[in-house]
A protein has these predicted regions:
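Conserved Rossmann-like nucleotide-binding pocket used by diverse enzymes
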Residues: 4-6, 31, 165
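Residue-level recognition of beta-strand->loop/alpha-helix junctions
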Residues: 9, 34-35, 88
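Active-site acidic/histidine proton-transfer and metal-coordination neighborhood
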Residues: 78-86, 92-182
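Catalytic domains of carbohydrate-active enzymes, especially glycoside hydrolases
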Residues: 17-39, 123-126
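Glycine-rich, proline-tolerant flexible connector loops at the mouths of alpha/beta enzymes
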Residues: 32-78, 132-139
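Structural motif corresponding to alpha-helix initiation and N-cap regions
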Residues: 13-17, 66-71, 174-177
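Boundary/entry segment of secreted carbohydrate-active catalytic domains
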Residues: 1-14
């Protein structure tokens, strides 16, 4: 059995390196590191603010992290003796929703999740946790669902060696197991 922990379980003052070391010290086998957009990209008044996780900003892997940054984190985890099992984050939820109808936001969302997938490969993680966007007042449910399904499929094709896990959260869609199974 592998027992892991998500980076968000640690204090906001911990950067990703602190969280990796603390996870090992606390006896965890693995850690899910979190990913976000580069500073200044998040919208005001969104879920990031409501959950008060904005203080984590720039303590996470982000869209500006280089392959060298990610490789350095991999080396730290290896030297610490802990596995990075997955990469997760809210970048595809409220920052750049996968369901965005605006072409620029949609491109940023796809690019961000591709960066998560590429980072997972460098880290030796086999899973990326993605939130499939969100439903807003100006969207029809089926249109948002179709966009999410199409974009998740394209992302899965980008990195077939990485599992793409879809997280069901308070995003206004995927209310039942039936929807998740389609």
């Amino acid at each position: 059995m592998n027992i892991g922990v998500n980076q968000f379980c640690f204090p906001m003052s911990y950067d990703v390196a602190d969280a990796v070391k603390a996870a090992k010290r606390l006896g965890f086998d693995s850690i899910e590191v979190c990913f976000t957009a580069a500073d200044g990209a998040r919208p005001g008044g969104g879920v990031t603010d409501a959950l008060d996780i904005s203080g984590y900003h720039n303590r996470l892997l982000n869209t500006n992290s280089t392959d060298a940054d990610v490789s350095e984190l991999k080396k730290l985890a290896d030297d610490t003796g802990i596995r990075i099992s997955s990469v997760g984050g809210i970048v595809s939820f409220t920052i750049y929703p996968l369901t965005a109808q605006d072409p620029q936001t949609a491109r940023k969302s796809m690019d961000a999740v591709k960066k998560m997938l590429d980072s997972a490969r460098i880290l030796g993680a086999d899973t990326v946790l993605v939130i499939p966007g969100m439903l807003t007042a100006d969207m029809e449910y089926q249109a948002a669902y179709d966009l999410a399904q199409e974009r998740v499929a394209r992302l899965a094709a980008h990195a077939p060696d990485i599992q793409l896990a879809v997280e069901n959260v308070w995003n206004g869609m995927l209310y039942s197991p039936l929807e998740m199974s389609r």
